[in-house]
Amino acid sequence: MKTLKQAESYIKSKVNTGTDFDGLYGYQCMDLAVDYIYHVTDGKIRMWGNAKDAINNSFGGTATVYKNYPAFRPKYGDVVVWTTGNFATYGHIAIVTNPDPYGDLQYVTVLEQNWNGNGIYKTELATIRTHDYTGITHFIRPNFATESSVKKKDTKKKPKPSNRDGINKDKIVYDRTNINYNMVKRGYNPVGVILHNDAGSMTGLQYKNNLQNAGYNRWAQGIAHSYISEGQVWQALGESRIAWHCANQWGNKNLYGIEICQSMTASDEQFLKNEQTAFYEASRMLKKWGLKPDKNTVRLHMEYYQTACPHRSMKLHVGKDPTKTSITQADIEKLKEYFIKQIKMYYEGKTPVPTVVNQKAKTKPVKQSSTSGWNVNNYGTYYKSESATFKCTARQGIVTRYTGPFTTCPQAGVLYYGQSVTYDTVCKQDGYVWISWTTNGGQDVWMPVRTWDKNTDIMGQLWGDIY
């Protein structure tokens, strides 16, 4: 059996991906659940039937089936099953990612496939979504192994240490299967690299499954040359091709785009490892082109476009979160200096040691005060502290966002009709008034709550109640 920590890694890896376990009917809800149970039981259990039949499977001591009742408390990693009402025919099934998001046992947040019925076309990927308990009748709880039992089993074979805090260059997996589209040739080598944070949750090779055949409309939204996580490099485009990765004509044409993956979901430890693989790859490419790592050849996305990218790296190595506060030119130079030093170590055949700043000692944000009590950051976002509870009255619900208060940022989820959330910040940006809060998992989320006209400062009707 896998541990809960190993199950958590699996769950995070499946966000925004599609799982077709049996090769039939595309990405059905049951495919993800079957694959999950098969994974955490080390291949011992392969569930059968439709989603509603999951509760009738025999798990041979690897999991326990619980019938839902008003006081039942689900846990992270449980499998939740719908079998009644609209779900009586086939059922629905998902994996619990937050057992009680609002602290009232009225809702559960899950990772699921095919909620909207488009899994058969493979256009609906695994999504984190919050539901009330309508139709939910059972939970299946894997009997996870304890960390201590796993450690005891592993004591006979101890892996050799790998390059201190750096990477094992010999174990990097490269996949150079490019996207199914011929981008324009540059005609000369890139003049440098630009390091991005992906604002996503997928590994480098998972991006291949998601983007390789995604189609022109998706690529036009942005496509880099390489997508990199720990020990994984997917080269989506050859170095001779122009990529669309920094919303700047010169940057797109002349710089090689590297996406450091999982910037929204990876632990600090994991993201630092992802960075190291990216630094090594940057050093390898620069050396190939006869370029040395310096301020002209190592670039950041925010040097070319008004963006928070690379938000996670900035927070770790400078101590400032660009989604919440202003970033100065000095901050940019500080992060570039860190990137250059790390890349240069690999360039010279040495092994760098990743470092992070003391978050408690981070620089206070630069603020511009307006006459109405709002502060303005260098992205033009008006913001101020405000603590209250917002209850959604929009029948269709409201989409929430990661990264920042922009409708182009990655979707975090949906606050459904009747659901409430407690927030601590209010912003005005991108044609809307937004509220922001930090989830139990430590992620910052933004949600628009009414329209806003920047020219007149007129606000539309509120999409809920504040109390």
From Swiss-Prot:
InterPro entries given in the database record: Amidase/PGRP_sf, Amidase_domain, CHAP_dom, Papain-like_cys_pep_sf, SH3-like_bac-type
Domain Peptidase C51: 4-141
EC number(s) recorded for this UniProt protein: 3.4.22.-, 3.5.1.28
Any GO BP annotation: defense response to bacterium
Active site (record annotation): 29 (for endopeptidase activity), 92 (for endopeptidase activity), 112 (for endopeptidase activity)
Domain SH3b span(s) in chain numbering: 385-455
Keywords: Antimicrobial, Bacteriolytic enzyme, Calcium, Hydrolase, Metal-binding, Multifunctional enzyme, Protease, Zinc
Record's cofactor remark: Zn(2+) is required for amidase activity.
Enzyme class: hydrolase
Residues where Zn(2+) binds: 196, 301, 309
CC cofactor: Zn(2+)
Alphabetical list of SMART domains matching this protein: Ami_2 (SM00644), SH3b (SM00287)
Residues of the N-acetylmuramoyl-L-alanine amidase domain: 189-311
CDD domains: PGRP
Keyword Hydrolase: yes
Region (Disordered), start-end ranges: 148-169
Family: Belongs to the N-acetylmuramoyl-L-alanine amidase 2 family.
Summary of the function given for this chain in its UniProt record: Endolysin that degrades host peptidoglycans and participates in the sequential events which lead to the programmed host cell lysis releasing the mature viral particles. The CHAP activity cleaves the peptidic bond between the D-alanine of the tetra-peptide stem and the first glycine of the penta-glycine cross-bridge. The N-acetyl-muramidase activity cleaves between N-acetylmuramic acid and N-acetylglucosamine bonds.
Protein's name in the database: Endolysin PlyTW
Organism, scientific name: Staphylococcus phage Twort (strain DSM 17442 / HER 48) (Bacteriophage Twort)
